[in-house]
Amino acid sequence: MPRILFAAGVATLSVLAAPANAQMPRIELTAGFHRIEAEVAADQASRMQGLMMRKSMAANQGMLFVFPQAERHCMWMRNTFLPLSVAFLDAEGRILNIEDMEPQTEDNHCATAPARFALEMNKGWFAGKGIKPGQRIGGIEKSPRPQ
């Protein structure tokens, strides 16, 4: 009986740890001539996890958040160790606004208009590439449907 309980406990811990360690789907996006390899957070659990607990991210990698509805979504940086910039996008992938975010803060960074997507990149990535509000992120149409 103790072996069964131990095995059940290990199985439960594995299931609880799985979302944080699970591979998210990836998508290739473009911003002007710049290629982005983005993990896709299309369900509630992956949107809540986001980039929490990450210690590093490659220069042209990011995370695309796919929301079920266009709203004035907000992001924060609780348990996020990387300084990030977030671009809020409309349904066609047009950048509404870009916000810089500091690690481990709970300040809200919100879309200035209803957004269907948010793209998080290393802090300063958009500014460094000359990417500004009004420009379009390509490849958004290939993103999975939100859940």
Regions found by a protein language model. Give the residues of each.
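Positively charged n-region of N-terminal signal peptides that target proteins for export
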Residues: 1-4
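Juxtamembrane cytosolic interface motif at the C-terminal end of transmembrane helices
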Residues: 17-21
